[in-house]
Amino acid sequence: MEFELSRLQPKERASFALRALYEDAGCRKYHMGRFEEYGLYQENRSFLSSEQVITFTDLDGRLLALKPDVTLSIAKTAQPAKGETLRYYYHENVYRPSAESHTFKEISQMGLEMLGTVGEAEVQQAVCLAAKSLGLLGSAWVLEISHMGYLFGLLDALNVPAEMRPVLLEKLRAKNAHEFRTAAEAAGLDRSEADVLVELLSLNGSYADVLPKAEAFCRNERMRNAAEELRALAEPLEAAGGSIRLDLTLAGEMEYYNGLIFQGYLKSLPRPLLKGGRYDLLIRKFTPGAGAIGFAVYLDELDRLSAPLPPVQKQQTEKVMLNVALPKGRLGDKVYNLLAKIGYGCPEDYNATRKLVVENPEAGIRYFLVKPSDVAIYVEHGAADVGIVGKDILTEA
């Protein structure tokens, strides 16, 4: 009997394609067990996406954990020699809490790590492999790139206190200019300094357009060094195809990333499929003087590509419809009225008809009226492309 690749699920086909890509690039497969001693995660909590870990006591009395992270285990055991660069790829399951379901999820990951001597060539290879990974997974993709050194350099130039930096990075990630400015002023910046910081929000767009602006915006040597590293990536990335964007509002966790960071998207998927960056701070806890860069591909996200559409989305229209999950109540009404004023209203009044789905095919928009707590679930499962929620729901999440 012949084996047909078409019978495989998208994530199964992806794993074969990515394995070939990484092995051709000189990476060796890294094998690890399902369990890790809990002490590793307890001692390195700041490097984890969540402090919640599934633990159990082994028969010999040791406290073990179902691994929530692969990179941490590789960083602990790799131990590259001076002058050596280790290249690994992995295909593992990790166990993390889901903000949407408030339960633990088993997540299938493939990833790539380069550890040891990590210079310009290794950085370029890792980022280009991230772009090629996206190219193998879909025809329409976007890779967004930023640099934590650039952001730290600007915070240094403005003398932002260390204890206020995590708050500012959180507001920067939210891309909310008003709250970003408020946080900047709370950190002790005057109006002109806050204006400089808020200008970061404009450094977002195509790589070729934004890079010269980022170079001109530099305030110190640390920012210039980061801009030079971004400039060195321009030519290799140009040959990668796809859409490459420079987004200096993209900020990783400051305890984890210290250089380039990047994340990748595929058309029709609501959140990043690929995330990565440079994490020298982590590898140096185990191997002093070493560097590291890598990324993970979240294969489970590819299941959405083969999932059946909700019945309302199967209706054929000439235009591609934007599906919006609106919370029932005042917030939903307010957002709907704002959108209606600029041409995105619907012929029928959902409050009058009590319908939970209304649409305007001419404007290419469809609204789902849902409980505020269900908005994230609609987006999570791909029924809606975007959702509107208030601060109370965000706080709960």
What positions do the PLM features span?
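Acidic, His- and aromatic-enriched active-site or binding-groove loops in soluble protein domains
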Residues: 52-58, 160-182, 266
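Positively charged, Gly/Ser-enriched RNA/tRNA-binding surfaces
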Residues: 7-25, 36-37, 71-82, 89-139, ...
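Short, conserved phosphate-binding/catalytic loop or strand-edge motifs used
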Residues: 106-110, 146-153
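Short secondary-structure junctions
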Residues: 28-32, 55, 243-244, 343-349
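Short, extreme N-terminal leader segments that mark the start of a protein/domain
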Residues: 1-32, 318-330, 335
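Polyanion/phosphate-binding surface patch
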Residues: 34-64
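Glycine-rich, N-terminal phosphate-binding loop and its surrounding beta-alpha-beta segment
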Residues: 52-102, 373-389
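Domain-level signature for soluble enzymes in the chorismate/prephenate branch of the shikimate pathway
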Residues: 130, 317-397
